[in-house]
Amino acid sequence: MMKKTILVTGGAGFIGSHVVRLFVEKYPDYHIVNLDKLTYAGNLNNLKDVEDKSNYEFVKADIVDSEAMLKLFQERRFDGVIHLAAESHVDRSISNPTEFVFTNVIGTVNLLNAAREIWKDNFEGKLFYHISTDEVYGSLGEEGLFTETTGYDPHSP
């Protein structure tokens, strides 16, 4: 029996696939559900090495679909969420900001609402991690680095 069921959104993306692989391999008694819309940034080939693991499951879905998200949460009863699904390419944010708002804002709200709905009677032990992008810090010069205390300085929608 699996100890916990964890949802990873955007799990077929660059960072998400690394997170999925880490959890599948490090926590064999956890059920890892990878939810991805498989847009230009998602690629299931990133996860060929874990696709047949018994504790791994892929779900193709869009976090903007609030009904689908609530149904998925009700069926799987997630113990935790690692939310990486996002539109993050700056050039695309300039040419189509509406798509970014739907995915990054509405999609995140849909996940939070679904989590709240199934966790409302007992939040104990439940975790929701929202992963952002380094783009919120703006541009980095030739030297230096961003830290936990770096202020936000976004330059794109």
Residues covered by each model-derived region:
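N-terminal Rossmann-like NAD(P)+-binding domain of SDR-like oxidoreductases, especially those catalyzing
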Residues: 1-157
